Amino acid sequence: MSTDPDEREVSPALTVGDGDVDVSLRPRSLREFIGQPRVREQLQLVIQGAKNRGGTPDHILLSGPPGLGKTSLAVIIAAELGSSLRMTSGPALERAGDLAAMLSNLVEHDVLFIDEIHRIARPAEEMLYLAMEDFRVDVVVGKGPGATSIPLDVAPFTLVGATTRSGALTGPLRDRFGFTAHMDFYEPAELERVLVRSAGILGIQLGADAGAEIARRSRGTPRIANRLLRRVRDFAEVRADGVITRDVAKAALAVYDVDELGLDRLDRAVLSALTRSFSGGPVGVSTLAVAVGEEASTVEEVCEPFLVRAGMVARTPRGRVATALAWTHLGMTPPAGANQPGLFE
């Protein structure tokens, strides 16, 4: 039976249950934002420079894996500029007219945030080029030989685009961003600070050791850390005295199948199939997906990125291979002659 990727507690994607809580935990200034020190410093310079000049900053592209705070930074950028924020997403802009309507309603210094900007439809993207560069759009009226193009001015604005796949952006769109910031995964110590702040806002009693325990299982992602904190809170309120200690956190995360490295049932199923059924590989992702009863896209896009980053799975030209760390994590010994990724694979 296949698993809905968004139902996993360790999914970095925004789920329905995250929505309202995610907003309440969102930092309101660069000073409050935890982690990403290099990005924060760069943004502070971009924002302050624009404020000193009394103009709008360059268009800003935020790239990086999901759950690291790109939307939060967009909200902060608008707040730091004292500007209104208009939010939309790439998939919502299917036609050029959708974008034209939004651009025509902007006022000077507004911030327009487009999430998943790599998924914007081509007609809307081509209209965006002109709006970003010249602050105008050409609206086509009529059809066929009688169609005419009417230029419309757009108030000077700042576009903040967010993407998890910067390589999927077309060159012309990427080149129109004056500043690009790449966000990296968080260190456990940074996630501990995120958890302490979130616990304070949510009124959760969180022990220091408990924060460290949750942080190291959060895959370097604040969104996952906050979600696990809420699950542990539920456990503490129902089965303990409401106080989250390290033992309570460990017991709660065991209930939700999140192990000490942040792997869940699906991750371990992939590793188990790779080691037990295929002797460590190499094996193709489609075959591996059949072995665990999942779609190949789920294994490749949901499980594999973290397993590769954690050093448990290696991608080679011949297929996926379990590393020594994967065998160790499962408490197994690699059989003699087990395949290991070569130096140049």
UniProtKB/Swiss-Prot annotation:
Reaction(s) catalysed by this chain's protein: ATP + H2O = ADP + phosphate + H(+)
Residues binding ATP = 25-26, 67, 70-72, 133-135, 176, 186, 223
Q: Where is this region: Head domain (RuvB-H)?
A: 260-345
Q: What is its EC number?
A: 3.6.4.-
Region Small ATPAse domain (RuvB-S): what ranges? Answer: 187-257
Q: Where, by residue number, does Mg(2+) bind?
A: 71
What are the annotated GO cellular component locations?
cytoplasm; Holliday junction resolvase complex
Kind of enzyme, top EC level? hydrolase
Q: Which GO terms describe its biological process?
A: DNA recombination; DNA repair
Pfam families given in the database record? AAA_lid_4, RuvB_C, RuvB_N
Q: Can you tell me which residues bind DNA? A: 315, 320
> Which chain positions lie within coiled-coil regions?
none
Which keywords does this Swiss-Prot/TrEMBL entry list?
A: ATP-binding, Cytoplasm, DNA damage, DNA recombination, DNA repair, DNA-binding, Hydrolase, Nucleotide-binding
Superkingdom assignment: Bacteria
What does the entry's domain section say? Has 3 domains, the large (RuvB-L) and small ATPase (RuvB-S) domains and the C-terminal head (RuvB-H) domain. The head domain binds DNA, while the ATPase domains jointly bind ATP, ADP or are empty depending on the state of the subunit in the translocation cycle. During a single DNA translocation step the structure of each domain remains the same, but their relative positions change.
Listed under subunit, the entry gives: Homohexamer. Forms an RuvA(8)-RuvB(12)-Holliday junction (HJ) complex. HJ DNA is sandwiched between 2 RuvA tetramers; dsDNA enters through RuvA and exits via RuvB. An RuvB hexamer assembles on each DNA strand where it exits the tetramer. Each RuvB hexamer is contacted by two RuvA subunits (via domain III) on 2 adjacent RuvB subunits; this complex drives branch migration. In the full resolvosome a probable DNA-RuvA(4)-RuvB(12)-RuvC(2) complex forms which resolves the HJ.
**What job does this protein perform?**
The RuvA-RuvB-RuvC complex processes Holliday junction (HJ) DNA during genetic recombination and DNA repair, while the RuvA-RuvB complex plays an important role in the rescue of blocked DNA replication forks via replication fork reversal (RFR). RuvA specifically binds to HJ cruciform DNA, conferring on it an open structure. The RuvB hexamer acts as an ATP-dependent pump, pulling dsDNA into and through the RuvAB complex. RuvB forms 2 homohexamers on either side of HJ DNA bound by 1 or 2 RuvA tetramers; 4 subunits per hexamer contact DNA at a time.
Q: What protein name is recorded for this chain?
A: Holliday junction branch migration complex subunit RuvB
Q: What is the lineage of its organism?
A: Bacteria, Bacillati, Actinomycetota, Actinomycetes, Mycobacteriales
Q: Which gene encodes it?
A: ruvB
